[in-house]
Amino acid sequence: MEDFILRELDRLGEMLLIIARKLGLQEDVMPDYSLLDVKDEFDKAVCPINLDALLEQENPVWYLVETEKISDYGLETFIEILFHSDLDEDRKAAILHDALAYLDGKGFFSFKLHALSNS
C-alpha cells in the first residue's frame, strides 16, 4: 500500500523512469540517443514537461523543482536522461552541477549523478 501511495505522489518521477527505460538507460550498455529522441518519448508518454521551454530556462533545475514540483527521485532520473543525450556538453555539465548542488543541499545523495560528474 505504501508503494502505491508513493507512486501516486510521484507520477512525474515514474513517467520519467519509464521514458529512461525506453531510451535504454536501465540496460547494461551505454545508451545512444539524441535530444530529439527524448522529446519524442516525452510526447509519446504525454509528459507535462516542455523540454524546449525547460532548456531555455536560465536554471532548469530550479524550474523543475519550483514550477513542475518534481521530486528528488524524478529530478535524478530527468538529469540522467539529459546527460546521456546529445545536448551540448557544457550545458549538460552546468545542469548536472546545479542538480547535485540542489540535491546535496537537501541531503539527498545521488550515487548515479555523482558517478556521472566523475566520468
Give the predicted meaning of each segment.
Residues M1-S71, S85, D98-Y102, S117-N118:
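N-terminal alpha-helical interaction modules that lie
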Residues I81-S119:
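Amphipathic alpha-helical binding modules
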